[in-house]
């Protein structure tokens, strides 16, 4: 049992360890899908190219499967241009975005020669991002859901619809929520260090939710707003830098 899609980032500080684990795993490189992300002070035409080279050096790998711009802060348009060049050079297999929507997404789409393949955003039954999905569908861009189970929020996990469906399908509430994501066409990143929960996260492909059940879950969307004011969040992100030396 184990994951073959690994999601890391420069700001997480674990790229060296991730690269080492991949090399020691004995698993062929083409059977592992590796995503990393660049931080705002690595964004800019000419700057991002160097950041990509440093990333590959930290990982000690020849390429990553997917590189994302972590947040819409800094010169992300210039970063995108460098990322497109890196695709042509074989350093990146694909490129995408993280936490982009509205005008920030439009900025990229206006200049993109290579369209983003994913946008990684907070997404769960209380934050379903319906408008964003409509925009991404136009360019065949997938949603990757971080915090897919709503950060373990007790109110969400005790919603009657989930308890009811859990009994019906003999599944846990997180399994019901993850199955909802799959039915919606989302790529999910359920975070857990518990072997039991990791195993449970895989056991969601032996049942399906009905259209009516999916619609009931969809109607939960306006109950809570998890994410702090987005512009304030971006100001906080802008106050943090990663090293440009390693």
What is each of the regions a protein language model found here?
Residues 29-42, 65-72, 99:
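A short, structured active-site edge motif that brings together acidic residues
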Residues 16-23, 52-56, 83, 105:
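Short, well-ordered amphipathic alpha-helices
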Residues 71-246:
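Beta/alpha (TIM)-barrel catalytic core signal, keyed to glycine-rich beta->alpha loops juxtaposed to Asp/Glu
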Residues 1-32, 149, 244-246:
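N-terminal binding-site loop/beta-alpha segment at the start of enzyme catalytic domains
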Residues 1, 27-30, 59-62, 90, ...:
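Structured loop/turn residues at beta-strand edges in well-structured enzyme cores
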Residues 48-68, 85-89:
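CE4/NodB-like, metal-dependent polysaccharide N-deacetylase domain
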Residues 6, 64, 95:
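Glycine-centered flexible beta-alpha turn that most often forms the glycine-rich phosphate-binding loop
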Residues 44-59, 78, 103-106, 127-128:
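Short, acidic/polar
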